[in-house]
Amino acid sequence: MATETIAMDWVDIGTNGESRLAYLARPVVTGRLPAVIVMPAIHGINTYIKDVAIDLAKAGFVALLIDIHSPEQEPDLSNAEKIQIAVETLDDRKVLKDVDAAVRYLEQHAAVRADRLGILGFCVGGTYALLAARTPAIRVSVGFYGLLEYQSRTDNKPVSPLDSVAQFTAPILFHVGDKDPWIDSKMLAEFTKRMQQHQKSYELCIYRGAGHAFHEHFRDAYRPIAAQSAWNNTLIYLRWHLCGKRTV
């Protein structure tokens, strides 16, 4: 699908008079299409994550990219310590309410099949993609290297993905590198154990030699082979669960 057939625009998905910005990318075609909510990493909406939304649109999906920092200003991300503070400051309940708002927006959009909604996220957005797998309207969830467990429970982080496995209703595809310092083999083993214990549908893809953020082409962590493989797997998974197709 050529770039010129993709419509891109900022939209407001807010409710009850509250503004919430999101970035919409969709193929310009007749008929209704499946849609994917995109959750960015802590860096928020940048060129990289817009490219992800556009790539989804080129693949035949309506993509709605949530601004996890809206309506507040973007946080200071100038060093690792401040990035960690920004992650800890994000209120999970607020972000998941934004996911609910995105679901309602897409269900009412003329270009969207309301019964074919998925979610995709990266890093902290990958964590939110997993937490949103509890949402009945979400039919599939794909997470790239999202944190599976929290070091502690706080008002902002009351429930981790591991805590939520029993409530998952969507099938899960999870991508992670075997060199990721935030997601070790013990955490993955516990995730697998709980998914199997609760008989949840999932696929776990581990990429040798890849660390955290291996899909993000603007970072030193980028690994092109792992990134392309993970993206191909993502399209296969989304198309199977949202379109009933077995091929990319």
From Swiss-Prot:
It is an enzyme of class 3 (hydrolase). It catalyses: 2-oxo-3-(5-oxofuran-2-ylidene)propanoate + H2O = 3-maleylpyruvate + H(+). SUPFAM superfamilies: alpha/beta-Hydrolases. GO terms for molecular function: 2-oxo-3-(5-oxofuran-2-ylidene)propanoate lactonase activity; lactonohydrolase activity. Coiled coil: none annotated. Gene3D superfamilies: alpha/beta hydrolase. InterPro entries: AB_hydrolase_fold (IPR029058), Dienelactn_hydro (IPR002925), Dienelactone_hydrolase-like (IPR051049). Keywords: Hydrolase. It comes from the Bacteria. Its EC number is 3.1.1.91. The active site is at C123, D180, H212. Pfam families: DLH. Transmembrane segments: none annotated. Involved in the 5-nitroanthranilic acid (5NAA) degradation. Catalyzes the hydrolysis of the lactone to produce maleylpyruvate biodegradation of 5-nitroanthranilate. Belongs to the dienelactone hydrolase family. This is Probable 2-oxo-3-(5-oxofuran-2-ylidene)propanoate lactonase. It comes from Bradyrhizobium sp. The lineage of its organism: Bacteria, Pseudomonadati, Pseudomonadota, Alphaproteobacteria, Hyphomicrobiales.
